[in-house]
Amino acid sequence: MTSKRGIKIDVKNLNFWYGNYHALKDITFPVYENKITAIIGPSGCGKTTLLRCFNRMHDLYEGARYEGEAILYPDEINLIGKNVDPLLVRMRIGMVFQKPNPFPKSIYENVAYGLKLRGIKKKSILDEKVEKALRDAALWDEVKDRLHENAYSLSGGQQQRLCIARAIAVEPEVLLMDEPTSALDPISTAKIEDLIVELKKKVTIIIVTHNMQQAARVSDFTAFMYMGELIEFGPTEKIFTKPEKKLTEDYITGRFG
């Protein structure tokens, strides 16, 4: 379920401060359901800061302050509202980080961990959901005979797909991805990109990437940020071929970055 306009998260006048530092300034854009939205921009522009607002990661640090709205549909809760429990937000919005970060547990236990936290204890149900998540993460065929081996025995690309399986096992409504392929080789990167495109059938995805070719390949919409401000947002094809702002064009054509 979304709003009438197919929006999953409606971001309006979002501002964010680290202490006295005004990191994000009046950010407004829609995140469309079952689409991939890429956030691009030079280092330090606020991409990851914005991404981490959506699941309240900043709440872990003292002095973090939000203003504005990030309305999650269908129930229209403000994800950054002071009265909204960040733990409940994180149950609905999953995250995959830059470097693979599997738990020091078996492959199976990595995927089952979140399910158990949510009270699922029956082995047959856990088995079914673990297999489904690993299949959805395009990893099942590679690990089905070694589920009880340590996750660290997997390659880097496999570990990242395991982290994706772990995130999607609990069926989040939105999946945040912070440069999910930056630590991977080109073959592993291609597998993850194919996987991301496949996953959007089931989950809304927001991806931060330094790799503009990646943004062009996988995303439906692109947000270009510069110095804490959203410069331009629109369909990816338009942003990359006919941007409205000169700053966007300069960044995309490599004049700065």
Curated annotation (Swiss-Prot):
Keywords: ATP-binding, Cell inner membrane, Cell membrane, Membrane, Nucleotide-binding, Phosphate transport, Translocase, Transport. It is found in: Cell inner membrane. SUPFAM superfamilies: P-loop containing nucleoside triphosphate hydrolases. One of its GO terms (molecular function) is ATP hydrolysis activity. Disulfide bonds: none annotated. The keyword Metal-binding does not apply. InterPro entries: AAA+_ATPase, ABC_transporter-like_ATP-bd, ABC_transporter-like_CS, P-loop_NTPase, PstB-like. ATP binds at G41, P42, S43, G44, C45, G46, K47, T48. Part of the ABC transporter complex PstSACB involved in phosphate import. Responsible for energy coupling to the transport system. The complex is composed of two ATP-binding proteins (PstB), two transmembrane proteins (PstC and PstA) and a solute-binding protein (PstS). Belongs to the ABC transporter superfamily. Phosphate importer (TC 3.A.1.7) family. This is Phosphate import ATP-binding protein PstB. The gene is pstB.
